[in-house]
Amino acid sequence: MAGINMVADDLFSAKSNFEKHSGDTGFFMSLKRLEEQGLCKLDELPFSIRILLESALRKCDGFLVTKEDVMRIASWTPTMKPEEIPFNPSRVILQDFTGVPAVVDIAALRDAMVDLGGNPEKVNPQVPVDLVIDHSVQVDISGLFPDARERNLEIEYLRNMERYKFLKWGQMNLDNFRAVPPGRGIVHQVNLEWIASVARLENDLWIPDSLVGTDSHTTMINGLGVLGWGVGGIEAEAVMLGQPIYMLLPEVVGFELIGNLRAGVTATDMTLRIVELLREHGVVSKFVEFYGSGMANLSLPDRATIANMAPEYGATCGFFPVDEKTLDYMHLSGREPSHIENVKRYLTAQGLFHTSETPVPKFTSSIKLDLSTVEPALAGPKRPQDRVNLSEMREHWLECLNSPSGHQGHGINPENNQDSSHIEGRNVNLQHGDIVIAAITSCTNTSNPSVMLAAGLLARNAILKGLELKPWVRPSLAPGSRVVTEYFDAAGLTEDLATLGFNVVGYGCTTCIGNSGPLDEDIENAIDESNLIVGSVLSGNRNFEGRIHQKVKANYLASPPLVVAYALAGTLDIDLFNDPVGYTSDDEPVMLSDIWPSEDEINETLRNCLTPEMFRFRYSDVLEEPRWDSIPSEESALYLWEEESTYIRLPSFFEGIKAEPSPIKPIKNARVLLKLGDSVTTDHISPAGAFPHHGPAGQYLVRNGVELKDFNSFGSRRGNHEVMMRGTFANIRIKNQIAEGTEGGWTKHFPTDEVVSVFEASQRYQSDGT
């Protein structure tokens, strides 16, 4: 059946075998057979290209994937012109914000199948699909409260029960579909620690694990040697339904790593430096592949941090080939030893296992970094590529505060640098640069035990010195998996973090995606009263203006231990190399160097507290959760749409659909809706966070009887196309050059010269046919 995930014909006589751990024979489609036929020089192909080639070779059926496609990929060279190729990822991964609309479309296709007289149960994912519910939890209750996690989870279920009932229907009625309940972790960390197989058996053939996902940071899995990246919903749905995605055969930038990180420098610091270098180099729509002697000095979680931030450096992916470090991590994370051995044997036979003797492939271009040159750093205040050395942070902050508004500037007159607002009841003044949000968050860093333990040890050392957080700081700790709290407990660090206010608030994305929760009312009032530029410090991957919190304009990415350090300092207006982070009860200054844990302390703690049993234990019940298990659902081929729902609605895309589609017609007399500058992100195009009642989406909900307190977020309402149409380009910080002097989702309606919302203009143009 065309498009279904079945074994294609062996058109290149490439089927081969290897001896498995058990002594049995394993079969695979051999790339070396192509080399023997003179179609490629395998050692010269980047590993990432080899995986694209394996997919095409295995799926070559002469129809969806042709012999010409295989030969095109096999003949990849650094200088070849880009040509379109098919790629069949072996699975799809979803998070709930973008996954819900994908499942809505599958449900709608089933309805359309009935309308055409067909069997709706034939509409199913044809490849494994995992949806991890991680985007909905919000930090309503901060880390200052010991019961924050349980209370936030309870609120999450109350807000999202309608969505979760829908996903429960999908889990019960769709083939090849699995849902990980709320409170179990962040999709990319769960993928890294549990879902990914690195290689597996499919239709009697061993294949490399590969995937696409409906989240930009799907790229994190490339740190494990699994090729994957984020795609749009339509592409993801195509793969779910057994179709290839089509892409230009990419250029591959080689990134050579040499040396080792110095003591006190974290994987986060290294990653921010790599982001900066690759942004300067230019890698948009390209693969980046890492190699070099320095690779052996990076742990697998270090690599995963680098791979996670591929969207921030602009690449399609940042790929690390599978090597012994990969296998070590598979053992640590509790994978079956026999599977790990078979992975090594298969990938070695396939030419996909990297060793110190592996020849360096040819690359389109190359870049090099000596890891010993990396400095402790942050990135901000508005973009992840704007790295600043920790030693220069105070000077940088003051420059940004007073520079004209832009990618870094805030436009504050130097005469107003000392503006402040008194906070009643706290007996403190809030000033420019004060940090109101400090969040240990995001799979980017919470997947890395070294930096997480460093944060915990720094917290312990700070407590021993008698330090406390400043009263205006809202702290939170949101690990990407429950394994983190297992090793925190084993190391005795849970209590230390909690003492400072870093109680666990949930296992989900939280602050990293803008679900930072509300600031206290007196803090918000103080910000508004003096138009203060206040800050956040988070261990996330993005810090675009308006993303973290609408009141917080200066947002800095940093390692988890630096998040704790800045929470103690309470301000961006500090030189942590030379100024005290705080004072003891005897008014003795405490420097950052006094509480920063040594490498030996971190490594010894790591050795003593992290075990494979923790991963096995925590993932043994990952598909279960008491509230989730109690959600009622029943077997039904068709979803029962609720007419009054403002979360899940039957989309109109398939109305009047025919078995034979109508011919595509050209678009004529279209109008321009937006003209935008640089650094436009998915956040600008389709924001995921909170939204105001006065915009088109808010007004739609108000008209449908939804109270402001129940708005939830844009992301949570992506299962309703009516909300999403009104939310497109509705970011509160977007600047449309067509509607000069405005900020937010505004445009000019050309026939009348009126400034109206982007949604209203689009509807007028559609109605008028112009």
What are these regions (language model features)?
Residues 2-770:
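Fe-S-dependent hydro-lyases/dehydratases of central metabolism
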